[in-house]
Regions:
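Soluble acyl-CoA-dependent acyltransferase catalytic core bearing the H(X)4D motif
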Residues: 2-17, 35-405, 411-440, 444-449
Length: 449
């Protein structure tokens, strides 16, 4: 049989938000995101079975078979190209939990997996099968580089890899023919065409600048600095994870009662928990600044991942009254309700790339006073999903952030439950268990009101 010819190339470049992510990826932890799929009745699931499932489903997601490569000088932004030597086995591994096993040990393994850099010469993802000490139970830890997908894009990947999705053609596991890599001349022509288009239509760029200023809260001038706290010190290479779970309908009801959103309720609870922890350390800031990602899209498709996310800075009073905190958050969010996410990322990307070029990026993020913490919230599937015939009992989100934010909060709704993963540098947050208990109490208080 004749070898099929390569298809004509599509010039698929990294976006402005992708460039910001790449500029940010210079610290002691990589810019990775991940998810832990806890499988019901996972006993008997082995790496060979996982490989068979993924061999059918990875072709559904183009990015999982593509590498991000730099282009020659004058040829524009980095380029996504098909990995002609793609080998699924390079992306798979297996770990058996040591005694006694359990959730805490699983979370430790997941933290190690997410904090391990991905091979830049391969498609930027990996999957690790984690089994119990005696082969009892299983979980799949999926790790993606943030440049490959944001939170919403990550959900599209999970959906494509789960059972019962994809077209009949995709279900056959047909591997697409790799496209020919564009030649330097083609890249240069396309890059200059884009530059000329931007020069001819400056209004588009101006609108993005204005939108970015609004996202960052800079439309009316420079914001107040975030308070200096013991939680904001340069972080190292290790992370520890803990988890808080609550019934999603209870949080939805609390949000409606306060005229807010689920995310507003979570941010209020996070601010209350952090304030309580800081008080136990002898600190009493009057407010905390929380960074919340906002996306320019509601959903994503497996063939359109990437990053389309900006940031929203929320200044939250640290009062004990949860109702007052929530009212403040709702009022701020409403003033920026018309903001379309993504503009701030484009602006910050320019700044971050300049800092990286001057070797000043890491000192900047290690001592920044823009935010105290991050809260990332993604709406997951409402129904229970499965993988390889095994029911996915829980999905635990994990993302690591660089700089001087020693604890961040990753939030995901799935099948009627709301899960908050606390991701902390254990050297700077040795009292993470206390913070976890405080957050659980704050969320319980929010839903009881």
């Amino acid at each position: 049989m004749a070898t099929p010819r390569c298809s004509d190339p599509t010039i698929d470049r990294a976006s402005a938000t992708d460039l910001m992510t790449l500029a940010s990826d210079h610290g002691p932890v990589p810019m990775n995101i991940g998810a832990v799929l806890v499988l019901d009745h996972g006993a008997g699931l082995d790496l060979r079975a996982v490989e068979a499932v993924l061999a059918d489903r990875v072709p559904r997601v183009l990015r999982l078979r593509q590498r991000l490569v730099r282009t020659p000088w004058g040829c524009g932004r980095p380029l996504w190209v098909d990995d002609r030597a793609f080998d699924l086995r390079r992306h798979l591994s297996e770990t058996r939990l040591p005694e006694p096993g359990g959730t805490d040990t699983l979370l430790r393994v997941a933290a190690e997996a997410v904090c391990e850099p991905l091979d830049a010469g391969l498609p930027l993802w990996r999957a690790r099968l984690v089994t119990g000490p005696h082969g009892d139970g299983a979980a799949l830890v999926l790790v993606l580089h943030h440049v490959l997908a944001d939170g919403i894009g990550g959900l599209a990947v999970l959906a494509a890899l789960s059972d019962g999705t994809g077209s009949p053609a995709q279900a056959l596991g047909r591997v697409p023919v790799p496209a020919r890599t564009p030649r330097p001349r083609e890249l240069a022509v396309e890059a200059w065409r884009g530059r000329l288009n931007a020069a001819v239509h400056p209004a588009t760029g101006l609108r993005r600048v204005v939108g970015g200023l609004r996202e960052l809260g800079l439309a009316d001038g420079l914001p107040r600095l975030a308070p200096a706290t013991s939680l904001n010190r340069p972080t190292g290479s290790g992370r520890r994870l803990t988890v808080v779970e609550v019934p999603l309908p209870d949080v939805v009801a609390a949000a409606r009662a306060g005229n807010g959103t689920v995310n507003d309720v979570v941010v209020s609870a996070v601010a209350g928990a952090l304030a309580g922890l800081l008080r136990s350390r002898g600190e009493s800031p009057g407010e905390l600044v929380v960074s919340v990602p906002i996306s320019s899209r509601r959903t994503a498709q497996p063939d359109r991942l990437g990053n389309e996310t900006g940031v929203l800075r929320l200044t939250v009073p640290t009062v004990a009254d949860a109702s007052e905190r929530l009212r403040s958050i709702v009022a701020t969010a409403r003033t920026r309700a018309s903001v379309r996410g993504g503009g701030s990322a484009a602006m910050m990307g320019v700044v971050f790339r300049a800092l990286a070029g001057l070797r000043l990026y890491q000192p900047f993020v290690d001592h920044q006073r823009l935010v105290n913490t991050f809260v990332s919230n993604v709406r997951g599937p409402a129904e229970v999903a499965s993988f390889g015939g095994h029911r996915i009992a829980a999905v635990l989100p994990v993302a690591v952030v660089p700089g001087n934010v020693s604890v961040a909060f990753d939030v995901l709704s799935y099948a009627g439950r709301l899960t908050v993963t606390l991701v902390a540098d254990p050297a700077l947050v040795p009292d993470l268990d206390a913070l976890t208990d405080l957050l659980a109490a704050e969320l319980a208080g929010e839903v009881r009101r």
